[in-house]
A protein has these predicted regions:
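N-terminal, polar/charged subdomain of small-to-medium soluble alpha/beta proteins
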Residues: 1-94, 100-112, 116-159
Length: 159
């Protein structure tokens, strides 16, 4: 179980330094960091901005659960993640994750596991905007939308 508050969902700009500080400790010989950045294209379509929505309370609880799982499964690691919501432009950071461990391999593995679990389990929704309008990303059918918060865990394929 982590000592520090290590997860958040917020509208303000993200800081790599903040998540690194959350995982820094004397026994850590390596810290791995991942920052997910808004890019200007997705699957061949131009992207001008992203809108992220979340049920913040549920998202934070699930992120906290993921942190606890990883730290329990991979003894000796500490992980932290902050996800941004609201309107983000190209080049903005949407998520920052960090993991510390006694050795670099464990830090890289923990950081990768953290982002993978967040992307597959946390109820945060992404809408891409471009010259042709907007589209929700990752939703297979209309029942899976930000309006259906209770239905975010499903087996429709993409997460």
């Amino acid at each position: 179980m982590s000592i520090a508050v290590v997860v958040d969902v917020r509208e303000s700009a993200l800081s790599i330094d903040e998540v690194v500080k959350n995982v820094t400790r004397p026994g850590a010989g390596g810290i791995a960091v991942f920052s997910g950045i808004v890019r200007d294209e997705s699957e061949g379509r131009a992207v001008t901005r992203l809108d992220y929505s979340a049920y913040a309370g549920m998202a934070k609880r699930e992120m906290r659960k993921i942190v606890d799982e990883i730290e329990s499964e991979m003894g000796g690691v500490r992980v932290s993640a902050i996800h941004r919501v609201g309107q983000l432009g190209v080049g903005d950071s949407a998520i920052v994750c960090a993991a510390s461990a006694p050795h670099r391999d464990e830090a890289f593995r923990a950081c990768r596991e953290l982002i993978d679990r967040i992307k597959s389990r946390v109820p945060i929704w992404k809408r891409e905007w471009g010259p042709g309008g907007a589209a929700w990303v990752g939703w297979v059918d209309a029942r899976c939308s930000p309006a259906s918060v209770g239905h975010y865990r499903h087996a429709h394929g993409k997460s």
